[in-house]
Amino acid sequence: KWCFRVCYRGICYRRCR
């Protein structure tokens, strides 16, 4: 598992997979 930051339309959040 690993996490990375996702930013879209000024909103950033962390996604883990």
Curated annotation (Swiss-Prot):
Tissue-wise expression: Hemocytes.
Keyword Repeat: no
Modified sites of kind Arginine amide: 17
GO-annotated cellular components: extracellular region
Species per Swiss-Prot/TrEMBL record: Tachypleus gigas (Southeast Asian horseshoe crab)
Family the entry assigns: Belongs to the tachyplesin/polyphemusin family.
Disulfide bonds listed in the record: 3-16, 7-12
This protein's name: Tachyplesin-1
The keyword NAD is assigned to this record: no
